[in-house]
Amino acid sequence: MIRVRAGERRITVSGHAGHAPAGQDIVCAAVSALMYALAGYLEETEQAARSDIRRGYADIEGAGDCGAAFALVRCGMEQLAAAYPGCVEIIGS
């Protein structure tokens, strides 16, 4: 299961969805795409405070006026959690 902890300017994800074999899991791919897009956007707009993305784990923190970007990613994660129960869990804020 992928666990997502999302705040206004920080989001951490860990784990694996277990929806399909490694390299074929669309849920893991979707979560990764959201996290890479957020990291890229924050870097491009010079709002990245810190990012750590590796296999099975990502932790991204923003600076400045980046709340909308984090809200967008959280919304995407919530939609994945609803579409794939048992694969993605949103934990607190």
Task: Please report, for each region that a protein language model flagged, where it lies by residue.
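N-terminal intrinsically disordered, cationic/polar leader segments
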Residues: 1-26, 35-93
